[in-house]
Design a protein with these regions (language model features):
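Basic, Lys/Arg- and aromatic-enriched nucleic-acid-binding interface segment
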Residues: 19, 23-28, 38, 58-106, ...
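Active-site/catalytic core of tyrosine-dependent DNA strand-transfer enzymes
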Residues: 146-194, 200-201, 205-206, 213-214
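Conserved tyrosine-mediated DNA breakage-rejoining catalytic core shared by Y-recombinases
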Residues: 102, 111-154, 235
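C-terminal catalytic core of tyrosine-transesterase DNA break-rejoin enzymes
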Residues: 20, 97, 101, 108, ...
């Protein structure tokens, strides 16, 4: 089995699959072997004993197989100006503006419904991502997203803000990403080697702009704004119990409003 696992990893690498995908394959094989170890017994012998007494794949490393994950890069200021100077449909401009000013994930924004657009008692407009199915399996992505003053929404309507196709998992990121990249993001790349600039880059842009604020907001505040995994002093259960008390919407609003977006003018 260890030899077979390595051969499988080699074959998947030859097909151009990423290391993370190959790890998923091995994880599935691990699960199958562990199930067999725990549930399948040789009943032709006395006493009955398991066919497999240990997982022979446990120590097989596939860290050197497959393409390593490539991280996306934030757009340069020139590219941001170029992007928002392009002629585009109103809904496309709205979505790109939401991404660069809030740091939301593409799927979070592409799946927005008008009933998620709300105002708090202080008149702060926000997207309510605290309820319903999450696009990321992370409880901390459930949050309230404060909208800065530079983000203007059209007149409130009903249904979805955007109309991208849903995949089998009920997500829109694949269709939205393909469309926005081909129509806009690819056009602002410097050359063919500048291939890490995609629509997801706008989330990186907002993260970088937030971190460059003076004074710099705490990492916990930044995490609550963008919905990243939380790594502060509180445990997950403590954070869940105190959700909406950890960081007030007005704090998020004040922070995102400090970020300047001259490319939107």
């Amino acid at each position: 089995l260890p030899v077979h696992a390595v051969k499988i990893a080699q074959e998947l690498e030859n097909r151009g699959l990423a290391n993370a995908t190959i790890k998923n394959y091995k994880s599935a094989l691990d699960g199958l072997v562990v199930f067999a170890k725990n549930n399948l017994n040789n009943e032709t012998v006395t006493p009955v004993r398991p066919w497999i007494v240990a997982n022979p794949l446990a120590d097989v490393s596939i860290s050197n197989y497959g393409a390593k994950k490539r991280s996306w890069e934030a757009l340069t200021e020139d590219q941001l100006h170029h992007l928002f100077s392009l002629l585009m449909l109103g809904k496309d401009r709205l979505l790109l503006t939401i991404l660069v000013t809030t740091g939301m994930r593409l799927d979070e924004a592409a799946l927005l419904q008008w009933d998620q657009v709300k105002k708090d008692k202080n008149g702060i407009t926000y997207f309510d991502l605290s309820m319903g199915a999450l696009v990321k399996n992370d409880k901390f992505s459930a949050r309230l997203v404060a909208l800065p003053d530079c983000l203007s929404l059209p007149k409130k309507a009903t249904g979805k803000l955007f109309n991208f196709k849903l995949d089998d998992d009920g997500k829109s990121a694949k269709d939205a990403s393909r469309y926005l990249n081909e129509k806009y993001l690819h056009r602002v790349r410097f050359d063919k080697n500048d291939d890490r600039k995609v629509v997801h880059s706008l989330r990186h842009n907002l993260s970088g702009l937030l971190q460059n604020l003076v004074p710099t907001p705490s990492s916990e505040h930044l995490d609550w704004i963008t919905g990243h995994d939380m790594e502060g002093a509180k445990t997950a259960s403590e954070r869940k119990r105190t959700y909406n008390q950890d960081i007030d919407l007005s704090i998020k609003y004040e922070i995102v409003n400090r970020v300047k977006h001259p490319w939107l003018k």
